[in-house]
Amino acid sequence: MRNTFILTLLLLLNIANISANIKNLNNNWKFFYGDIPEAKYVDFDDSEWKDIRIPHDWAFENGYSANASQKDKGGYLGGGIGWYRKEIYLTEKDLSDDFIFIDFEASYMNNQVWINGNFAGERPYGYIPFSFDIKKYLVEGRNIISVRVDNSMEPSARWYHGCGIYGNVSLRSHKNAFFEKDGIFITTPSKDKVCVNAKVISAEKSANYLAKLEIFDKAGKCKAQSETLEFSTNNNLSLIHISEPTRRSYIS
């Protein structure tokens, strides 16, 4: 059996500061097992809550039970509802970026997020990463992140799952323009052509950018490159032709 080996693709754009500023938020969270709707508010007193670090799994933390709501399919662990809160401090410089997102790598399940008492969004079910644009809710100085995670409808899976925020949490900011998170898609219409679909998010409603596509092999040698391409925030990038595509054989 023979498969075409797809070479590494590099996109070089002339957008200033296109790289993200990322701040890890895993440390110094407060956690409460139970449902307290008032926990979304800034002035809520969480001083008696448990100090935890992300990643966190309250089902495993609470232990096993023959009567646990996940039953045998979930390893005899429980479910329920949990609340998380975190305090962060931001400077005027931190808030100067055009876009500020909060990124959750994984949280199970049915997540709701508030920033300073403002509802930022929700992510039904679990397993996949999710993000919310929270710049408009942030202030200089003290900010409160509140997260409600609902595992009250158990069993909810055919195997053990964690309960809570079990993946990294981070604050991600961009100036002016950036590639949408997980927004670059590469397809091969034929063995010698690569099609790139790259979505750019811009602070300007309509903007044009220049891009150059280069493809490198495993040794770092440039195998193909495009001319400088002009595209807008609403258009895709173009095809690039590879005159001598590298192939790799697989035996199965």
Regions found by a protein language model. Give the residues of each.
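Sec-dependent N-terminal signal peptides
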Residues: 4-14
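Boundary at the C-terminal end of the N-terminal hydrophobic targeting segment
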Residues: 18-20
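Accessory beta-strand-rich segments of carbohydrate-active enzymes
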Residues: 23-27, 32-35, 74, 79-181, ...
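Predominantly extracellular/luminal regions of secreted and cell-surface proteins
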Residues: 30-60
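Aromatic sugar-binding surface patches on proteins
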Residues: 128-130, 234-239, 243
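Surface beta-strand/loop "capping" patches
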Residues: 176-204
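Beta-strand-rich binding/interaction modules
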Residues: 193-231, 238
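Single conserved hydrophobic/aromatic residue that forms the stacking wall/gate
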Residues: 240-252
